[in-house]
């Protein structure tokens, strides 16, 4: 019941968020004209402000700090998109990134260390995870081995941690090596899972739908695997147990295994990015479809709106499952 209530709330919130954000500027008397590809890409993209919704002519927006080091005067500048100083502007030809003009008018890209919408949500996720696990740690410190098993929220977290630790990491990595990787893999799982779930909240950013984030996660995983690997792992990479003619004189299998060091993290990166971006794009598309109901008759419009809401609920339920599966696979 709680899950259904959450899904309905998120679906209705998405409709209200999208409606207030775009309906006011696209009504021409005949209905609402929505450019679905433009709206989808706009909501998936990163930005220097966090736009939540619009009521009439009032925009509810959080202007995030833009921190750049100028390549023209060499100075640091801190401002927001609401108050851009002279010499800086947002270049729409470069996805709205901040640029500055040199003395001769040439566009120059400064060193950009801004807290964008994606960065802000990453900070929120990190604070949320620290709050969850530190509170659970305090609960355990107050008890000993004779205390009853935890219930409620702490019990749910323990169940999830033990499932990933005992049923996933331990059998997959091996009895002798799993302790070395357990902390990293648990951290990676809960970070991706929480980030995916937070991204489903209406108005939130799609962090794991950004290729830069998944690239960094895949790079960290590649380092963790290869830096802490033992000699058995490298023996299977450089001299695998295959017929000798596959290794000498042409090292076919070693070359394939070495290529796999890069291709496997690359596959993880693309899989997480593509699944999360596609899921959000489909949900946004179904949200946009509801506005076409105003251009149809009453009966057809109500039918289209009902179809859109049902499909949006289905996609939300599917995305909750995908959020867990993608964290599990990664």
PLM regions: where:
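Membrane-interface alpha-helices at helix entry/exit sites of multi-pass transporters
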Residues: 171-172, 176-180
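Hydrophobic alpha-helical transmembrane segments and adjacent short intramembrane/lumenal linkers
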Residues: 182, 187-201, 212, 216, ...
